[in-house]
Amino acid sequence: MITVIIPTLNEQNTISQVIELVEKSANVSEILVVDDKSLDSTVKIARAKNVKIYTSTKLGKGSSMYEGMLLATNGIIVYLDADITTYPENIVNLLTDPIINNTADFVKATFNRQAGRVTELVAKPLLSLLFPELAHFSQPLSGM
């Protein structure tokens, strides 16, 4: 089975849509929303969707992702950003089928957009230095 982790921070306008998309995936048995102390209605909206909600103990998306991983109860974990509303309907299957079929150990998706400053000035140089085999990732911080 699959756990989907959705890190959030003030995503009241999109969280419902992302959760509903994930709920359509047959192999997902756990949806974790790890909130980074949102000031809007993100948590209230997610709670109404009957998913597991946790408040991150440290600020930042990375901390929320890490804490979600520690809380996950399944062997396959998918991270989806709460602010992306253009996911394909079968995004969870696209990301997990190669793992389930033993053709990949790790799957990283990307989308067609310009990389941001943090990606270009921090993430990519760090990947090149610490994990050269991952340096070719065009969107290492994307939420897929």
Predicted features along the sequence, with ranges:
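Structured catalytic core of nucleotide-sugar glycosyltransferases
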Residues: 1-131
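Short glycine- and hydrophobic/aromatic-rich loop-to-beta-strand nucleating segment
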Residues: 119-120, 138-144
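Aromatic-glycine-rich donor-binding/catalytic loop that engages nucleotide-sugar donors
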Residues: 129-139
